[in-house]
């Protein structure tokens, strides 16, 4: 966080205007004004709180897109947890504790961690919070900090009573969510259609290679959409807020995982594609993948969880859980023990029988050899903390993963199982899978956008023919603003597309930008995707995730609004950059991520 500037400090109340500040601070109790002395103390407390907060965080501060991204709801909000008794902490009833715990996991856990040990935000454990006291913490929660701590009360997100509740809650011992082991998983494991009773051949007339799997976030569903006819094939119940869709190596099975760690295995050969097996692998999750290496196609699936911090390898036909591995361990660099390092992205290697498992807080990438689960071998490679999402280069040999809060891209050689490079990029890189294309000067490059700034970083990926540019940031493209989540291209396209759904400016969040890859110097053109959708209500209409069809001549976008508003899918002609089709249907509730079967199966992006 930035230290407080003179301008910031001068914007705080002086002794002469404390009476007006009294009302703004909510410092009157039962209608009786506070004394000037008490109010002055509170003003000083507020100043010191904000100054300390500013000094404690990242140098440049957090942007609105970063805060929006980190503060997402956790499914742990609905999990019962034990309230321990700490005699030093302020008193809380069980009802107050349960309410505060729910608020914490809905608003705070994404930054401060499940156990309040700190993640991208600072620790909020009793050893830190008790010495500060309730009044100090109330000011901090209510008014936020210049570095990105939200102003929960003044923004209207929390009431004064909520702020008081949370100030007391973070002085309690952190409640620990239950572990989730093999017995728990097997209670949820269900084989809907046994493998030997499934179709022996494709039983439908769909071009399944051009089906799109679209997350219907708040409905707890996915939509399978025919990429040829633009018609919805089916709506399938899933876990909450499916984070990603991944394909089996054969292209037959679709795996999706919700934030609540429920995995669905969907058979695209069925007359009407549907779930054939399901399981819950934990309490919160983001990643699922299947085995890709020759000889192991479709043999295994893997899911990684945020809580408990672990991954599980499953049978590729039935999702039976076979092997659970914890990811708790020590942070790269500091070597401090971390009790909850979350499993972020997972990809299947095309060069070895390995899953590439990225562990967020410890900054470790695990090359997990699945050739013998009874004698499991893992190669642990450290790079930078806060590993998140990423994708393969065009040769599929190199895996590029964002260490988002470290502002770096870690590059791994999947053939030799080693770290190839760590590349400094912009603020909070968020590539999704990223985008591969041939630059006229630098040769093959991989691109990522950023949550925290307006740039797109291009990184060279060819150490043979363009060695001088390999695994370096060779260029930056300028976009309209931060808040980017996904960037995409296609081998048959001349265009590079980038969204910015978390940008606070609706003009930016409701559109996408497109670059001509043969003439990057001329900048971008803007496509008003939300406007093209023709939705007339007051929904947010955030435009999310460019995704090509199999042929590479269409680009699909989600137009995402709240569940009580109208959403849509918009299809654009890649060559002309003109509107081609708007898909509207009452069943398209909060569409966000969407994944083309062929491109996902073959890692084309």
Annotate the PLM regions.
Residues 280-300, 304-353, 359-361, 375-381:
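Asp-box/WD-like beta-propeller blade repeats and closely related beta-sheet repeat scaffolds
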Residues 61, 65-103, 200:
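Electrostatic cytochrome c docking/interface patches
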Residues 60, 65-71, 115, 119, ...:
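Extracytoplasmic electron-transfer domains, predominantly the class I c-type cytochrome c fold
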Residues 445-446, 482-564:
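Loop/turn-rich, solvent-exposed surfaces of beta-rich toroidal or solenoidal domains
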Residues 231-236, 274-279, 320-325, 329-336, ...:
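A short beta-strand motif characteristic of beta-propeller blades
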Residues 192-206, 247-249, 289-297, 337-351, ...:
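Structural signature of eukaryotic scaffold interfaces centered on beta-propeller domains
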Residues 93-117, 136-143:
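Sequence/structural segment immediately N-terminal to covalent heme-attachment motifs in c-type
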Residues 267-270, 316-320, 369-373, 414-418, ...:
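Short loop/turn segments immediately following beta-strands, especially the blade-tip
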């Amino acid at each position: 966080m930035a230290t407080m500037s003179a301008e910031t400090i001068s914007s705080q109340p002086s002794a002469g205007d404390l009476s007006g500040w009294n009302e703004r601070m909510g410092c009157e109790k039962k209608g009786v004004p506070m004394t000037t002395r008490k109010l002055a103390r509170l003003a000083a407390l507020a100043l010191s709180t904000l100054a300390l907060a500013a000094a404690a965080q990242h140098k440049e501060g957090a942007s609105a897109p970063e805060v929006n991204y980190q503060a997402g709801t956790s499914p742990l909000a609905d999990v019962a947890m034990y309230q321990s008794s700490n005699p030093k902490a302020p008193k809380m009833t069980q009802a107050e504790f349960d309410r505060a715990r729910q608020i914490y996991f809905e608003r705070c856990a994404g930054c401060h961690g499940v156990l309040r040990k700190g993640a991208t935000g600072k620790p909020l454990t009793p050893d830190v919070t008790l010495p500060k006291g309730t009044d100090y913490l109330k000011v901090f929660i209510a008014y936020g900090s210049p570095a990105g701590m939200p102003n929960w009360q003044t923004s209207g997100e929390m009431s004064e009573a909520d702020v008081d509740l949370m100030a007391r809650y973070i002085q309690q011992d952190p409640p620990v969510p239950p572990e989730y082991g093999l017995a728990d998983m097997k209670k949820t494991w269900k084989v809907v259609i046994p493998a030997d009773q499934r179709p022996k051949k494709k039983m439908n007339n769909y071009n399944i290679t051009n089906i799109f799997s679209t997350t219907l976030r708040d409905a707890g569903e996915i939509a399978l959409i025919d990429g040829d006819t633009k018609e919805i094939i089916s709506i399938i119940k899933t876990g909450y807020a499916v984070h990603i869709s991944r394909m089996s190596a054969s292209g037959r099975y679709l795996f999706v995982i919700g934030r609540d760690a429920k995995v669905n295995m969907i058979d695209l050969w069925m007359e009407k594609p549907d779930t054939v097996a399901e399981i819950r692998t934990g309490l919160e999750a983001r990643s699922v993948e299947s085995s890709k290496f020759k000889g192991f196609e479709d043999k295994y699936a893997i899911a990684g969880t945020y809580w408990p911090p672990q991954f599980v390898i499953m049978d590729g036909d039935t999702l039976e859980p076979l092997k659970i591995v914890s990811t708790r361990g020590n942070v790269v660099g500091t070597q401090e023990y971390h009790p909850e390092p979350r499993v972020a992205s997972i990809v299947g290697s095309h060069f070895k029988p390995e899953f590439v498992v990225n562990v967020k807080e410890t900054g470790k990438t695990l090359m997990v050899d699945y050739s013998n689960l009874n004698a499991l071998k893992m190669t642990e490679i450290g790079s930078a903390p806060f590993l998140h999402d990423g994708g393969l280069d065009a040769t599929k040999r190199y895996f590029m993963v964002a260490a988002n809060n470290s502002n770096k891209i870690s590059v791994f050689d999947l053939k030799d199982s080693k770290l190839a490079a760590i590349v400094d990029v912009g603020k909070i890189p968020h590539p999704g899978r990223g985008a591969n294309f041939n630059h006229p000067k630098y040769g093959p490059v991989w691109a990522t956008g950023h949550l925290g700034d307006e740039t797109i970083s291009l990184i060279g990926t060819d150490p043979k023919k363009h060695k001088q540019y390999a695994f370096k940031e060779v260029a930056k493209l300028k976009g309209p603003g931060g808040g980017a989540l996904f960037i995409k291209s296609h081998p048959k396209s001349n265009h590079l597309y980038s969204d910015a759904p978390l940008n606070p400016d609706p003009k930016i969040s409701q559109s996408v930008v497109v670059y001509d890859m043969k003439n990057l110097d001329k900048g971008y053109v803007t496509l008003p995707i939300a406007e093209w959708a023709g939705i007339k209500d007051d929904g947010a209409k955030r435009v999310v995730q460019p995704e090509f069809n199999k042929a590479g001549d269409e680009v699909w976008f989600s137009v995402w609004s709240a569940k009580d508003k109208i959403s849509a899918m918009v299809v654009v002609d890649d060559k002309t950059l003109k509107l081609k089709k708007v898909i509207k249907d009452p069943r398209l509730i909060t569409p966000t991520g969407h994944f083309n079967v062929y491109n996902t199966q073959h890692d084309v992006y």
